[in-house]
Amino acid sequence: MTEQETLALLEVKRSDSPEKSSPQALVPNGRQPEGEGGAESPGAESLRVGSSAGSPTAIEGAEDGLDSTVSEAATLPWGTGPQPSAPFPDPPGWRDIEPEPPESEPLTKLEELPEDDANLLPEKAARAFVPIDLQCIERQPQEDLIVRCEAGEGECRTFMPPRVTHPDPTERKWAEAVVRPPGCSCGGCGSCGDREWLRAVASVGAALILFPCLLYGAYAFLPFDVPRLPTMSSRLIYTLRCGVFATFPIVLGILVYGLSLLCFSALRPFGEPRREVEIHRRYVAQSVQLFILYFFNLAVLSTYLPQDTLKLLPLLTGLFAVSRLIYWLTFAVGRSFRGFGYGLTFLPLLSMLMWNLYYMFVVEPERMLTATESRLDYPDHARSASDYRPRPWG
């Protein structure tokens, strides 16, 4: 730009700054802004005077630069508002307009909150923090489960969450494993339970049939005799000595139970029980209980048996030991026919109890609570016991 163009621009800026009272619109190239009375602005007159001395090309370049400068000056921020020296004129008829009442602005969040909560975080900062609801952490009580009954079928169903009602394939397998016991292929219809019940009953029935047969066969065909035991004390001592052999399966079970505790690292007394350890523990506990009941009745039976039938004492002792070993084996395998081994122990115990009660109340009631010798061991009393049976009614 030449010196004349620079001077023209400075004069335009000086003249526009005090006279601008409203934002000016953009003026296209080649047009001049018109005033209210149609008179041109003094800045434009000076521009024309200054540019008339130059060449035509310079005049056209000056006009283009002036138009672009005026358009840029109209968009500047300091020219958009009214200047304090030139107040904005009031529009005509503004006094006829009634002022509208000011709308009540809604209270902000900080104004609505009480004074105690005035030190809360701002809204934007509070979005970064997620409040913790204790009700979401606590487990829902059992009373919250919704139980509905279908009107048609009349069956009550407990509605569970959708994740439980439609489990994943892995969860479905676990659910089926819990509902259906291992080795059950009936699909949960209940036929496997009936089969297990039938097997248990059949095994106990087989023990009921074989128990007297085994006892009679051993009594008749085993070649050994019992020594002469005329006194009650000698019979009790003989019975207790026979009971030592019956403790063999119990002691063996205790040893295996201790080894299982060491092998499976289940030394914690209140830890989670394991199947390999619980099998032997239950066997030992049950065997000790049956041993006490079995030999208590066997000792009482030895005081009532005649001399010829004292051979039953060692036979019943051996039957107890064998039956306990059979039960232990079948219980460890997990078969339902373990009732056979249990029946070989419980049925002789029940038979001895019935025999003792029969002798105490029917055959020899006078010796129920005394320690006298049995009259069945003497030759003169070798006759039938019915000849000497006292009647309670006389």
Swiss-Prot record:
Q: Which GO terms describe its cellular component?
A: lysosomal membrane; trans-Golgi network membrane
Sorted alphabetically, the Gene Ontology BP terms of this entry are: cornification; cuticle development; epithelial cell maturation; establishment of skin barrier; hair follicle morphogenesis; positive regulation of epidermis development; regulated exocytosis
- Keywords assigned by UniProt? Golgi apparatus, Lysosome, Membrane, Transmembrane, Transmembrane helix
Provide the tissue specificity.
Expressed in the epidermis of the skin. Expressed in epithelial cells of the outermost layer of the stratum granulosum (SG) and hair follicles (at protein level).
Membrane-crossing residues? 204-224, 244-264, 283-303, 313-333, 343-363
**How is it placed in the membrane, per its record?**
Multi-pass membrane protein
Q: Per the record, what ranges lie on the membrane's Extracellular side?
A: 225-243, 304-312, 364-394
**GO molecular function terms listed in the Swiss-Prot or TrEMBL record:** identical protein binding
**Is Membrane there in the keyword field?**
yes
Report the subcellular localization.
Lysosome; Golgi apparatus, trans-Golgi network; Membrane
Write out the topological domains of type Cytoplasmic. 1-203, 265-282, 334-342
Disorder noted: Defects in TMEM79 may be associated with susceptibility to atopic dermatitis. Atopic dermatitis is a complex, inflammatory disease with multiple alleles at several loci thought to be involved in the pathogenesis. It commonly begins in infancy or early childhood and is characterized by a chronic relapsing form of skin inflammation, a disturbance of epidermal barrier function that culminates in dry skin, and IgE-mediated sensitization to food and environmental allergens. It is manifested by lichenification, excoriation, and crusting, mainly on the flexural surfaces of the elbow and knee.
Function statement: Contributes to the epidermal integrity and skin barrier function. Plays a role in the lamellar granule (LG) secretory system and in the stratum corneum (SC) epithelial cell formation.
What name goes with this protein? Transmembrane protein 79
Species annotation: Homo sapiens
The organism's lineage?
Answer: Eukaryota, Metazoa, Chordata, Craniata, Vertebrata
